Each structure stands twice: as structure tokens, then as C-alpha cells.
Amino acid sequence: MNFDETVPLSQRLEWSDVVPLTQDDGPNPVVPIAYKEEFRETMDYFRAIYFSDERSPRALRLTEETLLLNSGNYTVWHFRRLVLEALNHDLFEELEFIERIAEDNSKNYQLWHHRRWVAEKLGPDVAGRELEFTRRVLSLDAKHYHAWSHRQWTLRALGGWEDELDYCHELLEADVFNNSAWNQRYYVITQSPLLGGLEAMRESEVSYTIKAILTNPANESSWRYLKALYKDDKESWISDPSVSSVCLNVLSRTDCFHGFALSTLLDLLCDGLRPTNEHKDSVRALANEEPETNLANLVCTILGRVDPVRANYWAWRKSKITVAAI
């Protein structure tokens, strides 16, 4: 902020021709907001130029001052876009302005909407910059919804798919529990025009996911991702030996949580998997003498014990099991 911006607008020669427009709260406001004087005056001058539709360099500067006081004001962002277009302003400078605002308030829908508008105007040449911008934001908050949404929009609208799978791997190497990174990985393999789609990527992704599962069987995200790799292909889901094998591998271990392996096996059984003796033996080894002859019922009973938070859910699943799911 330069020196002139610390001087009240009413004392600046540049604004001497403008009559500020006060906020109309009606004749008898019940609880008028006690705005700070700087904010009140800035908004009064903004209203004046907004209603006169002044699209000038000083109007652009005023929107900046106003947004620095309240970056969530949608009307100010909207008017700023009108002024930017009227002045044919350098939009690369605008990206820098947005980044300054984001340093203090990145969880601001209006800011991201404006960022998308600017990036769309600039086109594919800024794809790399947008991906780097979201990378910086996500390094501070790995689950930042707006950053992920903007990143997916950037890939879809501007490009930059080439290194995205590697970026997802980088995030998962740092934190395999990062469900946002798993979600992004699925977005990439299903949407990237460079990879051939889900079916083409399935074999390598199943291998990748099983490795992650065996490293940490208590990570629900990787189990969910594994099932998603067979979306709309139940036959492959129940017939691929890799899936039931990873369940058996985890169930045979004594050093980990078995809940997600059991729930995956339950899904397989309910979808039509015919259990082998190995499946039956692995499940019965975890039973506490529960008197169940139906394997799927037994899995639900064990899940109610090892996953008590969702005990009611597993009881409901048990009630829906058909005789075929043995």
C-alpha cells in the first residue's frame, strides 16, 4: 500500500469531484453495523463510482483498496472485472494482485471465481502458472476445496495434464491418507485425454493401489480407490484375483486393522464372488465362535465388533444379505 492509500479518500485531490454515497439502512435501522471509519468511507466512494459506472484507472485502484478491506465483496469483484475489460488492463498484473489477496484469505469463493475469469481470458499459456498457484495453496492446506476445484478446472479448460499423475504420487508419498490426492488421481485417470481412460489404466492403478494398501491397511482411501477402479464393471471387480488376494493378505496379518479388508470382501460376496475355502478360513480365523454359517453374515458380525462406530450400519448390511451371498 503506498502513502496515498493511507490518506482518507475525502482528503485526496483525485477524489474531490466525487460525492460519496452513504449506505441506506432505512429510516430506523434496528442494529446498524458499527463500521470502521476507513471502511465506511471507502465503501461510500465505491458506491458513488459504481452507480455512476465510472470505468477508469482510479476506479480500478479504488476496487483494490476496497477488496483489501473486504475481499469477500462480490459486487466489488464484479465491477473490477468490468473496469479491467474497459481499460484493457494487463491481466498478468491481475494474477499477481489475486495472489496477494490469497495470502491472507485463500478460502474466498469470490477470489477463485475472479481467478478463473482472468485465467480463462489469458488462455492455455497460463495453465502452468495456475497449476503452480494451486500447488502452493495445497502445500499449506492439502484439502483446500477451492484450490482443488480450480486445479481440475485448469486441467480441463487450459491443459497441463502431462505431470498431474506424478503430482498425485508426490502427494501420496508424503501422506498416503490424503483422500483429496486419491480423488485427484481418480480424476486424472478418468479424465485425462493422454491416458486412455479407466479401463486402459486399471492394471497399473490396481498394482499401485494394492502396494499402498499393503503398506497401510488401515487407510480407507486406498480401499475406496481400489473399488472405484472397477466402476460399472462388476464382472471384473469380482473376477480379478488381485482384489480378493489383497483382502486375504491383510486378513492373514495380526499387526493391522482388518475392517476395510472385511468390508471389501463383503462387497465382493454381495456382488457375486463365490468364496473359496481360503476365504472362509481367513474369515473364520477372526471369528469369536459366532454361530454363522453364511460367510457374508459372519463378515458383518465381525465388522460390528471390529468397527463398533458403524455397528448399526453393519447390522443393516447384514439384514440385506441374500442367501446367495455365501
Curated annotation (Swiss-Prot):
InterPro entries from the UniProt entry: Prenyl_trans_a
Q: Does the keyword Repeat apply?
A: yes
Spans traversing the lipid bilayer: none
Q: Top enzyme class of this protein?
A: transferase
GO cellular component entries: CAAX-protein geranylgeranyltransferase complex
Name the needed cofactors: Mg(2+)
Q: Which UniProt keywords apply?
A: Magnesium, Prenyltransferase, Repeat, Transferase
Which residue intervals correspond to the PFTA repeats?
Answer: 55-89, 90-124, 126-160, 161-194, 201-235
The catalytic activity, as recorded, is:
L-cysteinyl-[protein] + (2E,6E)-farnesyl diphosphate = S-(2E,6E)-farnesyl-L-cysteinyl-[protein] + diphosphate; geranylgeranyl diphosphate + L-cysteinyl-[protein] = S-geranylgeranyl-L-cysteinyl-[protein] + diphosphate
Q: What are the GO BP annotations of this UniProt entry?
A: negative regulation of abscisic acid-activated signaling pathway; protein farnesylation; protein geranylgeranylation; protein prenylation; regulation of cell shape; regulation of meristem development; response to water deprivation
Would I find Nucleotide-binding among this entry's keywords? no
| Coiled-coil ranges per UniProt | none
Q: What is its EC number?
A: 2.5.1.58, 2.5.1.59
Temperature note: Optimum temperature is 30-37 degrees Celsius for CTIL substrate and geranylgeranyl transferase activity.
Q: SUPFAM superfamilies from the xrefs?
A: Protein prenylyltransferase
GO terms assigned for molecular function = CAAX-protein geranylgeranyltransferase activity; geranylgeranyl diphosphate synthase activity; protein farnesyltransferase activity; protein geranylgeranyltransferase activity; protein heterodimerization activity; protein prenyltransferase activity
Q: Explain the activity's dependence on pH.
A: Optimum pH is 7.9-8.5 for CTIL substrate and geranylgeranyl transferase activity.
By sequence similarity, the record places it as follows: Belongs to the protein prenyltransferase subunit alpha family.
Function field: Essential subunit of both the farnesyltransferase and the geranylgeranyltransferase complex. Contributes to the transfer of a farnesyl or geranylgeranyl moiety from farnesyl or geranylgeranyl diphosphate to a cysteine at the fourth position from the C-terminus of several proteins having the C-terminal sequence Cys-aliphatic-aliphatic-X.
Complex and partners = Heterodimer of an alpha and a beta subunit.
Return the PANTHER family for the record.
PROTEIN FARNESYLTRANSFERASE ALPHA SUBUNIT/RAB GERANYLGERANYL TRANSFERASE ALPHA SUBUNIT, PROTEIN FARNESYLTRANSFERASE_GERANYLGERANYLTRANSFERASE TYPE-1 SUBUNIT ALPHA
Task: Output this protein's name.
Answer: Protein farnesyltransferase/geranylgeranyltransferase type-1 subunit alpha
What species is given as this protein's source? Arabidopsis thaliana (Mouse-ear cress)
Q: Which gene encodes it?
A: FTA
